[in-house]
Amino acid sequence: MNNIFSKLRDFVGLNEQVEYEYYEEEPETDNNYQNLYQQENPQPPAPQESATAQNRRWREPVPTMGDDIAAGSKPMGNVIGMPGAINGISEVLVLEPRTFEEMPQAIQALRERKSVVLNLTIMDPDQAQRAVDFVAGGTYALDGHQERIGESIFLFTPSCVQVSTQGGVLHEVPQPPARPSRPTGSPNQTWGNETNRMAQ
């Protein structure tokens, strides 16, 4: 039995000796270190210059986030706007593709938060099925939704769009869950009740 495991380890390569290569560096003398340090780092500025710079920093008002918003200045650099949400206008793209090669346009539109109506009446039925499968997969990957509207006509929407009919809502936009309120009782009392239930 041990023989089988050793053969398996040999096959996988776990029994191989690991060879480490060591390089020995010559110890540097204190002179070389000091010379190297002085060449790399210039001398600090004169004390008077740094004192005036500190005074300038002390006297200048520091803008706060509220000041930036109130002044209507540019938002922080790490905030990225959502395409299509600039004016609150939603866009619907109607595609009537002739070939499968036009399908990445539909996926790109979904990535830009646009709804896509795909009319596949012009396409060959096999190509149309392939196109629907492709766009449906992309829609699923983007947490979007799909709905068949008619014969060879499909609606693909991003996750931020609510789809409804006269009979009711087919898909609602998920709302963030509300946090449950915490009990006002003491935590020790609740813990004690749980241990009593467990002991019984």
Swiss-Prot record:
Location in the cell: Cytoplasm
Keywords, alphabetical: Cell cycle, Cell division, Cytoplasm, Septation
Biased composition regions of type Polar residues, renumbered to the chain: 183-200
Residue segments, region Disordered: 35-60, 170-200
Signal sequence coordinates: none
GO biological processes: division septum assembly; FtsZ-dependent cytokinesis
InterPro entries: Cell_div_SepF, Cell_div_SepF/SepF-rel, SepF-like_sf
Highest rank taxon of the organism: Bacteria
Main location per the UniProt record: cytoplasm
Pfam families in UniProt: SepF
GO cellular component: cytoplasm
Family, similarity comment: Belongs to the SepF family.
Subunit structure: Homodimer. Interacts with FtsZ.
Role, per record: Cell division protein that is part of the divisome complex and is recruited early to the Z-ring. Probably stimulates Z-ring formation, perhaps through the cross-linking of FtsZ protofilaments. Its function overlaps with FtsA.
PANTHER family the UniProt entry points to: CELL DIVISION PROTEIN SEPF
Name of the molecule in the record: Cell division protein SepF
Organism per entry: Nostoc punctiforme (strain ATCC 29133 / PCC 73102)
